[in-house]
Amino acid sequence: MCGIVGIVSKNNISKNCYVALEKLEYRGYDSAGIAGLNGNKIQIFKKQGRVQCIKEFCDNANFKTAIAHTRWATHGKPCEENAHPIVSSTGECVIVHNGIIENYLEIKQNLEKCGVVFKTQTDTEVVCNLIEKETGNTLEKVKKACDKLIGSFALAVLFKGKNEIVIARKSSPIYVGSCFGGNMVASDILCFEKNAKYCALEDGEFAVVSKSKIQIYSSTLKKVKKSFKTIETSGEEIELCGFEFFMEKEINETPAVLKRIITEYQDKEKIQSAIKLFEGVKNVEIIACGTAYHAGRYGAKILQETLGLSASAHIASEFRYDKNNIKENTLAILVSQSGETADTLRAGELCKQNGYKVLAIINSMESSMSRLADVSLNIFAGKEIGVASTKAYSAMCLVFYILARYLKNSNFDTFEIEKLADQSKEVLKVDSKIVDLIKNASRVFFIGRQFDSISSLEGALKVKEISYKSAEGYPAGELKHGTLALINNGTPVFVLSTDKNMHDKTMAAAEEVRSRGGIIILISQKSFDKGCADFVINIPESEKELAPLLSVIPLQTIAFETAKAIGNNPDKPRNLAKSVTVE
């Protein structure tokens, strides 16, 4: 979840490191730091806070070899002491790390017996000192240390007097490439210059990066030849383009994203390989985390209703340890915006080990998940920077819908649903009175039935993530089984009712809330009876399977506007990071 950058060049790359870190800040923003070679010495500067806290230093530094880091704390509280880069006890090497070392306490105790004095609370300092104690050249030292580590890591190591960076990878993404007058390592290809050549390190691989060369090694330190691709990422995707926050920009990009998906998948060949995976399949297990899990719930339901398939959605961190989840003739579908979600990747690896076919629905076709899966479907959402996912959720759901329709009817044409993109433009604005209501509430509830119950979960998650309000989503029928005890005068309850067949029952639940003093914010199709609603958000008329793609947009906007009204940064909520690359 941390962001790693390293550059070795003939030029001063201090500012390049800073700019690259800014692009990685979505991965964590508890603290930031940089370490560079200054003659034969290593100079380190780090601060608690966002990346901008090291800007002045980077503007004035003169490093041609440097590593840098933006941190999301796992071991040790966010503070300057625990910020990366972390230096070894004698100062021989300095390290930046993304991941979790599970056996760090055992190694730490052994090192303390050898006289090492630790200055931080991090697991990273253990790795740094372990490397220092090993014998051999720089690569061999890193390799020997990594062999003793249990857990996940991407490491970039700088040694005193060596104009090179040693890289190691296990279960945490890391890329190498050529740019900035030399060579570079980074956690995300966003950091590279456009048209730069890059490749991903695979699990167990190492690399030594100098200004003139990138040499990749296998787990046994045999030299590996790899093909490099050209960066084609548009810089515009990571610019605000007139918006104050990325989350606002990304919500407003949803109509264009939906339009692109409809256009891209009009070409059935782009989805044909995924369709073939369903041949002979009796069970579908959809595996994901967070917002992607909610999209997986939508996907399971659309496959059940459209095809009559046995389909279930699972939280990835639980699926790995469930008993009796291995069945014959099963397809696993992994869902992830980044394609690097650690728990989903580990669950996917388990599925492969047990003979499952694996389909990935992702937003990054260069990700670890794409390489793991038999087939990957692109959600075409473009880069999503805001920590709280918005346009990617809508995109995942639409890809599931299109896949289900193609599986049911090979003659399906995506332009049958092209009005969806235009309809989504109609629900981007919300009543400021609703925002004021949520801002002043201590807790918020969301209820719905069937597809709407899934939207309720996602709406609650958005409010929770960025406004820090207590927010929960429930199936409407569950109100009487506990939740009504929490409803009193003035409690806001979002009632989602976009399915005509469920509307009367859902409104009956709304009446129960109203009778206890709750305030009803109804989201429904324009033609539906509004009953006891205090506030109404109308969505355009649409089939029940597509209505959730419309109803979720005002929920995202309300969450965004509420966070902004409170004074929170919607793009960077406390304690969270965009890409969850640790378990």
Predicted regions and their residues:
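Short helix-capping/linker segments at secondary-structure and domain boundaries
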Residues: 12-13, 133-140, 163-164, 405-414, ...
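Acidic/histidine-rich
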Residues: 152-182, 441-465, 500-502, 507
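Conserved short alpha-helical segments that host acidic/polar catalytic motifs at enzyme active sites
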Residues: 1-240, 244-245, 259-260, 269-280, ...
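Short, glycine-/Ser/Thr-/acidic-enriched flexible segments
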Residues: 9-13, 39-41, 49-50, 72-74, ...
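Active-site phosphate/pyrophosphate-binding segments
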Residues: 253-285, 375-492, 502-503, 566-583
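Glycine-rich oxoanion-binding loops at beta->alpha junctions
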Residues: 64, 68-81, 261-274, 300-335, ...
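Glycine-rich phosphate-binding loops that contact phosphosugars or nucleotide phosphates
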Residues: 276-422, 449, 496-540, 558, ...
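Generic C-terminus detector
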Residues: 542-583
